Amino acid sequence: MRSLIYRQLLTNSYTVDLSDEIESIGSKNTQNVTINPGPFAQTGYAPVNWGPGEVNDSTTVEPTLDGPYQPTSFNPPVNYWMLLAPLNAGVIVEGTNNTNRWLATILVEPGVASTTRTYTLFGIQEQITVENSSNTKWKFIDLMKTTSSGTYTQHSPLLSEPKLYGIMKHGGQLWTYNGETPNAITNGYPTTNYDSVNMTSFCNFYIIPRSQESVRTGYINNGLPPIQNTRNIVPVSISSRSIIHQRAQANEDIIVSKTSLWKEMKYNRDITIRFKFANAIIKSGGLGYKWSEISFKPANYQYTYTRDGEEVNAHTTCSVNGVNDFSFNGGSLPTDFVISRYEVIKENSYVYVDYWDDSQAFRNMVYVRSLAADLNDVLCTGGDYSFALPVGQWPVMTGGAVSLHSAGVTLSTQFTDFVSLNSLRFRFRLSVEEPHFSITRTRVTGLYGLPAANPNNNNEYYEVAGRFSLISLVPSNDDYQTPIANSVTVRQDLERQLGELREEFNALSQEIAMSQLIDLALLPLDMFSMFSGIKSTIDAAKSMATNVMKKFKKSGLATSVSTLTDSLSDAASSISRGSSIRSIGSSASAWTDVSTQLIDVSSTVNTISTQTSTISRRLRLKEIATQTEGMNFDDISAAVLKTKIDRSTQIAPATLPDIVTEASEKFIPNRAYRVMDNNEVLEASTDGRLCAYRVETFEEIPFDVQKFADLVTDSPVISAIIDFKTLKNLNDNYGISREQAFNLLRSDPRMLREFINQDNPIIRNRIEQLILQCRL
């Protein structure tokens, strides 16, 4: 465009701080090789290992080995082993159903010749003959009778070096061990009413689930782990297993310590995290068979949920780190299917979810310690994405799945225009799951991970439930709020100034003379002349330009620019005003995905109006790269901006960067663009209106979407400053020649000035409408 301000912003023709450039490069750099980011990745905090403190949990986790418990009499649960650990020889356990089974187990020390000993069994003294020929191992012997007055018989002896024994109720039988360690095996005794058998233990014992078979057998054969063989382990009463566990409250605010001005508050919160992935799918130029990129993008999600009767408003941002780059090349022909790069997250990737809600816990989250979280896992499965080829069957990327496992939590900060919010960043490590992903009708199959094509699988969101805990240093007076950063107050004050400046700018639209505007739009405005009304020195202007570019780099228009190919960026920085247009190949990427949408309009539920309303920014970028010798919308925008800056009484260095950036995106939102093919003109406006007509007669003809897409790819896009409605009205009322019509179609500034100097009401009204659209 004629005015250079936006092009200078696009090409970063002014120097910026080295730290800003390093930060920018680091944020845009894509790595094919993923490194382990560590537990404090992408945060500004040192790698300090804070202890989690106490985290109340409403979930009971069953221990592998529970005990030791003191000798007692009770009814053990079914499918749980009593692991008996006697210290001395004698009776160690007895149990009966009082009907047809009396079972007792005795322990005999090593090296005992056959002898008769007296044992007290079920309260009665009995004479039992025992022996143990082993000199190193202890001998467990089961004594059994089937009537209350019967005689005991000996069964299933176990020679044990660790001196451990087990008994369990399961499947209608009483189970014990027999044989010789380290190869002991189990043996069962059928017992009626087995589940009601009471056991009396005469030694310390443990309880271990039947499901832990390999662990339990290892204990029987080899002994308890070393930590259990110490006098620091004190047996407790079995009644401790019956303690009622209080369920933790969903919201808990606990005062840890307090002084006159400050207090430490511990916040325990149940949490529901909902998040979703976002992606970018970009087609390459050409015939429509090639895709340049399928990548993940950060995704914001806002939602509400109920926590302990309280409605919580939450906000999450999901991003990925450590993506894996894949590609598919079906051949070198223009009609061969190609995906230059598509991203996949796998076990070497991480998913970050930044979470904030409006509860008390986040109000003063500035000085925080003892941060901990416990979250459930979540399975993310990929859906189908069809690659719409112009001809032939469409390949479909389908499948793929990963599980997300909690891998830590740190503090993070989310910035808005009004306030910076301290939030929690939950980090998830990944593991690949079934099914694998593939691309149908290609050789790509049997790959694992989650591709970026359709990561949400048509789900609105993924959900993770859990709990977090933190201790925060907050003011003792609950009415005070800890200042998060000075930028909060500064930003709020700046927003007030910007609001006043916007009102002034919008009011100044009524005072701009159109002849002055056209003349100013023809000038090669640059950064220095744009800021000349504020600072006179070159150094100050450079500083101002640097600040403008810092703002502009984060704007929506700059984001769109960054998605274009390098060749388009080069063309945008080197193009000069002339009658011939180049950068055709580079600019194709700015339109290809839009043309595809328009071509496929018949197969979608969206209307042409809806689809064309989404292409305004790309048409605008195409206009920047393909200039003619006529004026365009950005010439008018820059001229209006310059005029308002000169007339403003409230403009200041602090507010100028925001105003320039905002103007580059919002001035003249309702734009119309045209392409020309000999005597035919096709126009598309950003509000969805399409029209086609012949220049000589201004007769409307059917709008050919395919032709429009082809012309946009191969021809300059012209700003329709004087749109078709205005042209037809001008011709019907005043009559214009063919040459005048073509000059107005090209937005020739000399022709525009001529009509304005003649005080033509139709042209004047059109320009006034454009000026009034230059609003903030």
UniProtKB/Swiss-Prot annotation:
Q: Does the keyword Secreted apply?
A: no
**GO BP, sorted A to Z:** permeabilization of host organelle membrane involved in viral entry into host cell; virion attachment to host cell
Query: Is Coiled coil among the key words of this record?
Result: yes
Motif YGL motif is found at 448-450
Keyword annotations from UniProtKB, A to Z:
Capsid protein, Coiled coil, Disulfide bond, Hemagglutinin, Host cell membrane, Host cytoplasm, Host cytoskeleton, Host endoplasmic reticulum, Host membrane, Host-virus interaction, Membrane, Outer capsid protein, Viral attachment to host cell, Viral penetration into host cytoplasm, Viral penetration via permeabilization of host membrane, Virion, Virus entry into host cell
Region of interest (Spike body and stalk (antigen domain)), ranges: 248-479
Motif DGE motif: positions = 308-310
* Region described as Spike head: 65-224
Mind telling me which residues the site (Cleavage) is annotated on?
Answer: 231-232, 241-242, 247-248
A GO CC term assigned to this protein in UniProt:
host cytoskeleton
Query: Coiled-coil intervals in this record?
Result: 484-511
Residues of the region (Hydrophobic) are 389-409
- List cystine links: 318-380
Name the InterPro entries for this protein.
Answer: ConA-like_dom_sf (IPR013320), Rota_A_VP4 (IPR042546), Rota_VP4_MID (IPR035330), Rota_VP4_MID_sf (IPR038017), VP4_concanavalin-like (IPR000416), VP4_helical (IPR035329)
Q: What are the start and end residues of every segment in region (Spike foot)?
A: 510-776
Domain of life here? Viruses
User: Motif KID motif: which residue numbers?
Assistant: 644-646
Pfam families the record matches: Rota_VP4_MID, VP4_haemagglut, VP4_helical
Extra notes? This strain probably does not use sialic acid to attach to the host cell.
Record HAMAP family: Rota_A_VP4 (MF_04132), Rota_VP4 (MF_04125)
The record's similarity note reads: Belongs to the rotavirus VP4 family.
Name recorded for this polypeptide:
Outer capsid protein VP4
Species assigned in the record: Rotavirus A (strain RVA/Human/Indonesia/69M/1980/G8P4[10]) (RV-A)
